[in-house]
């Protein structure tokens, strides 16, 4: 209970324990890698054995402490306005890696005083976190593969500490999805290929965040007005009716949420870095962000936006030019259908 009180004092919304052991889906993860389903996410191939078993991360590891931190925005933003791009809600505030990292450093110091040795991770480390979150009873894996919390819904981050402290494990939580298939049915690109099966190479979040090159033509229209991530399978989850706004001030909605897409096209490198300072969007880089913006304008823009896209074609990199040309063609095609 003392450890859980420390977590609560640091602002975490849940804290639970499970035994350090091989991850439940370790073999499935290896098969997934063997089938190249990680796409451009080469980092997932690093240290696969360590990802499967936290005991390889900390000598004498006994417990995995799993933490949940709510990020559901307090502000309501009208994203249905014409000409506005969509960001995944997790990116509305400051970069969660930095926010959670500071909390975990303080948590680790407190555990040291209790005699523990530990390492901590915020999704960048080698650990199959959803397996341990399920085992610890934080929530369960939905059919979209997203972890669902009974009080936070789908709007929370996971973090873990692997420790030598021997803590009594919590009970796993049963899967409560029942017959619901809303997340599967709503996916714009059919990336959820079956219950609990996700092909990231079809996922809009993958294309707009992880994919490094040109976005395949077959997926561009489905991306719609999304410029960073996709929340479709999260939004429809019925468990979100219990979700409450995050109390973490650093997750407050930033000024770029709700900005017109055309304004993004005018950002130079320094403007991009300034606007997205301390945001996860900054890690995407200006070139890939403008690639996404061009697609969003192509899907939602009007003829008045074409001169802005032509300016991009005259001044920007080959990848951005190619997506801007596609956007102009998409707008013209849509406009001709309206006029006819």
Tell me what each language-model feature is.
Residues 273-275, 302-313, 334-340:
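Amphipathic alpha-helical scaffolding segments comprising HEAT/armadillo-like alpha-solenoid repeats
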Residues 206-224, 235-267:
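A beta-strand-loop signature enriched in Asp, Gly, Thr, and Trp
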Residues 264-268, 275-280, 308-316:
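Alpha-solenoid HEAT/Armadillo-like helical repeat scaffolds in large eukaryotic proteins
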Residues 290-301, 322-333:
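Structural detector for internal amphipathic alpha-helices that build alpha-solenoid repeat scaffolds
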Residues 12, 182-206, 226-250, 308:
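Iron-sulfur cluster-binding cysteine motifs and their immediate structural context
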Residues 286, 316-318:
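Short inter-helical turns and helix N-cap capping residues of alpha-solenoid HEAT/ARM repeat scaffolds
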